[in-house]
UniProtKB/Swiss-Prot annotation:
Alpha-D-glucose 1,6-bisphosphate binds at residues 24, 123, 303-304, 367, 386, 388, 399. Its EC number is 5.4.2.2. The modification Phosphoserine is found at residue 123. SUPFAM superfamilies: Phosphoglucomutase, C-terminal domain, Phosphoglucomutase, first 3 domains. This is Probable phosphoglucomutase, cytoplasmic 1. InterPro entries: A-D-PHexomutase_a/b/a-I, A-D-PHexomutase_a/b/a-I/II/III, A-D-PHexomutase_a/b/a-II, A-D-PHexomutase_a/b/a-III, A-D-PHexomutase_C_sf, A-D-PHexomutase_CS, Alpha-D-phosphohexomutase_SF, PGM. One of its GO terms (biological process) is carbohydrate metabolic process. It catalyses: alpha-D-glucose 1-phosphate = alpha-D-glucose 6-phosphate; O-phospho-L-seryl-[protein] + alpha-D-glucose 1-phosphate = alpha-D-glucose 1,6-bisphosphate + L-seryl-[protein]; alpha-D-glucose 1,6-bisphosphate + L-seryl-[protein] = O-phospho-L-seryl-[protein] + alpha-D-glucose 6-phosphate. Binds 1 Mg(2+) ion per subunit. Monomer. Keywords: Carbohydrate metabolism, Cytoplasm, Glucose metabolism, Isomerase, Magnesium, Metal-binding, Phosphoprotein.
Length: 583
């Protein structure tokens, strides 16, 4: 059949400004007439013609509720805009890191390469009819659209008058692998449904020594548990951990992708990954039995990770520092060295200490993976990470949850080369972390999240903190009045970043109070929630003395926490006596 293209009249819809990772709203908002269509067309209009006409696009996501409807709408709009091919992961499933890998690595049967992707995800936000949906666009390098593009998309949403769509194009069966071909006014249009794991698994096997990891997993001394929280990581977990690496099926937890993530919150932290946390011996009550040696979890779209040892939590800030410190010896991909390392500004300075010690280039960037992407494209950065459970490398242009798990497995395999056979005790996750602290010092670190705060009140709190910064002597008077047992503030500012690659400047990236002993308080408003504002407070204290690195984090940070809450007048502005989540 030859499909026809019709033009639908529309008008701008307020609030379609993409955040750090696309547009996220409640499903009911996306289901409003023209809501999704306006945003998709605004994106097409923001791209240059060669990225649309005759191009190959990837459309997939984490499988959350409304994805199946959204994919069909985007296919019809892509056809109408002159796109030549759309690649879809079977059942709309492709993890965010796998989308990046597909853009960068995959070639079609005719040699075609993808120029970009619509990723349907709200990441770690809940899914279901009353929960969140999201969409973001990734570029031909496999990374999220830069601000120059997202700003253009937003401007386009404010002026849009119409969009083309191939309404008579039948829905494509996305449950079966294969190619469906159509004829349109501009010639052929193909939709190819493919296995979501193939390209990604191939890439992982080129990075890590699967044989070494397989050997570790085959040891009766090594036990392992992976929790996909019913997100898209489940589409990869069986293939990688069971089929390729020989783990037991019983090692996989919640690995069936579900539209509503099984009613849970697909955010891999100590609050939401309750089942894994209990199994690893970190729950409030003892589950009985010996916990596994190693545990890990993913979020909805599998770009985030949480790393756990037996009764031991690894902070994301420590995780990226430990991966960087061990990458050259443990991971074949890095055997010839690291080009540089980078972290987001709120992430602890543990990575800075490793970079200094190993004489590596180091970068501190705003929150948002696109900033790392620029450094990687310029060959300046190999390993990077964020405190928000995101870790990755230059193999793709997104953070990558399964990559981080394989990196940790590689480090464990490397450290236990001589211990796998025989009676020798395995070097544990906790051993590796404590040894790291003994070598580099420890950054005590915690994050307080205040979710769904009244946006006006959140803004007032931030303005109060900026105003305080105008006089450091005055700030120190207030600080000493609150707590005499903390160091003095050395400097305070609003973080601003000048990209060393393209010279672009990002302002208002978080409020910082930097103390004379290396401690930090950071306050940020987050752009990833779908309702209200989220205030994130980051508290960090550096301890170089190896004999003092074994304290409980909350105990060590207690004076700084007290100071942060009183200095910011948190309860006064928000009405909250406690945070929603403590990490």
């Amino acid at each position: 059949m030859v499909f026809k293209v019709s033009t639908v009249s529309t008008s701008p819809i307020d609030g379609q400004k993409p955040g750090t990772s696309g547009l996220r709203k409640k499903v009911k908002v996306f289901k409003q007439p023209n809501y999704l269509e306006n945003f998709v067309q605004a994106t097409f209009n923001a791209l240059t013609a060669e990225k649309v006409k005759g191009a190959t696009l990837v459309v997939s996501g984490d499988g959350r509720y409304y994805s199946k409807d959204a994919v069909q709408i985007i296919i019809k709009m892509a056809a109408a805009n002159g796109v030549r091919r759309v690649w879809v992961g079977k059942n709309t499933l492709l993890s965010t890191p796998a989308v990046s890998a597909v853009i960068r690595e995959r070639s079609g049967a005719d040699g075609s390469k993808a120029t970009g992707a619509f990723i349907l995800t709200a990441s770690h936000n809940p899914g279901g009819p009353t929960e969140d949906f999201g969409i973001k666009y990734n570029m031909e390098n496999g990374g999220p659209a830069p601000e120059s593009i997202t700003d253009k998309i937003y401007e386009n949403t404010k002026t849009i008058k119409e969009y083309p769509i191939a309404q008579d194009l039948p829905n494509v069966d996305i449950s079966a692998v294969g190619v469906t071909s159509f004829e349109g006014p501009e010639g052929k249009f193909d939709v190819e449904v493919f296995d979501p794991a193939d390209d990604y698994v191939k890439l992982m096997k080129s990075i890590f020594d699967f044989e070494a990891i397989r050997k570790l997993l085959s040891s009766p001394k090594f036990t392992f548990c992976y929790d996909a929280l019913h997100g898209v990581a489940g589409a990869y977990a069986h293939r990688i951990f069971v089929e390729e690496l020989g783990a037991q099926e019983s090692a996989l937890l919640n690995c069936t992708p579900k539209e509503d993530f099984g009613g849970g919150h697909p955010d891999p932290n100590l609050t939401y990954a309750k089942e894994l946390v209990a199994r690893m011996g970190l729950g409030k009550s003892d589950t009985g039995g010996e916990p596994p040696e190693f545990g890990a979890a993913a979020d909805g779209d599998a770009d985030r990770n949480m790393i756990l040892g037996k009764r031991f939590f690894v902070t994301p800030s420590d995780s990226v520092a430990i991966i960087a410190a061990n990458a050259i010896g443990a991971i074949p991909y890095f055997s010839s060295g690291l080009k540089g390392v980078a972290r987001s500004m709120p992430t602890s300075a543990a990575l800075d200490v490793v970079a200094k010690s190993l004489n590596l280039k180091f970068f501190e960037v705003p929150t948002g993976w696109k900033f790392f992407g620029n450094l990687m494209d310029a060959g300046m950065c190999s390993v990077c990470g964020e405190e928000s459970f995101g870790t990755g490398s230059d193999h793709i242009r997104e953070k990558d949850g399964i990559w981080a798990v394989l990196a940790w497995m590689s480090i464990l395999a490397h450290k236990n080369k001589g211990n796998i056979d025989g009676n020798a005790k395995l070097v544990s996750v906790e051993d590796i972390v404590r040894q790291h602290w003994a070598t580099y010092g420890r950054h005590y670190y915690t994050r307080y999240d205040y979710e769904n705060v009244d946006a006006g009140k959140a803004k007032e709190l931030m303005e109060h903190l900026v105003k305080l910064q105008s006089s450091i002597p005055e700030v120190n008077k207030i600080v000493k009045g609150i707590r005499s047992d903390v160091a003095s503030v050395a400097s305070a500012d609003e973080f601003e970043y000048k990209d060393p690659v393209d010279g672009s400047i990002s302002k208002h990236q978080g409020i910082r109070y930097l103390f004379e002993d290396g401690s930090r308080l950071v306050f940020r408003l987050s752009g990833t929630g779908s309702e209200g504002a989220t205030i994130r407070l980051y508290i960090e204290q550096y301890e170089k003395d190896a004999s003092k690195t074994g304290r409980e984090s909350q105990e060590a940070l207690s004076p700084l926490v007290d100071l942060a809450l009183k200095l910011s007048k948190m309860e006064e502005f928000t009405g909250r006596s406690a945070p929603t989540v403590i990490t």
